[in-house]
Amino acid sequence: TQKGGVLVTLGGGKAKEVQDQSEPSRQEGAILTAAHVDTLGAVVAEVKVNGRLRLSPIGAVSAHILETENCRVCTRFGEVYEGTCQLVNASYHVNGEFNQIVRNYQNIEIVLDEDVASAEDVKKLGIDNGDYVCFDPVTKITKSGYIKSRFLDDKLSAAILMGYAKYLKETGKTPKRKVYQYFTVFEEIG
């Protein structure tokens, strides 16, 4: 879509034209389900000369919540590398302004859990600008059955919609009515 969302048609029966628009037939019309996926992660914006990665956000990921978070860098070649997001000058004992620094995408970076010390070392791994960075959602299911996770607010709905699409594909079933799925990249607004 124009706003970056994804509209998927799952097939199904043909939605019939409704003659009287004031009384749409719920039995014959198409169905649209939606979920938002506004907090997606980041991409590598730069492989720095010291082997660390500068980021650019995808969606509404605030830099101040990412400090010390574990992450995965997914290359376009299918390799996955782990790392940690940290402040550029992360030493509390050396950085006298540690507590005053506003965390933003200009002063946080990814330190890879690999033996790298230069941009060349990182590029040998296949990591480059545009590769995806996925942050650990820190998911936990409590004894009482609650699910706690970062970025959960509507990812669960997105997972349910994708699970339904997978179910239809794997079983070969076709819905009786036309079914659309819409994944928005904005908070509940499409």
Regions found by a protein language model. Give the residues of each.
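N-terminal hydrophobic/helix-forming segments and targeting peptides
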Residues: 1-190
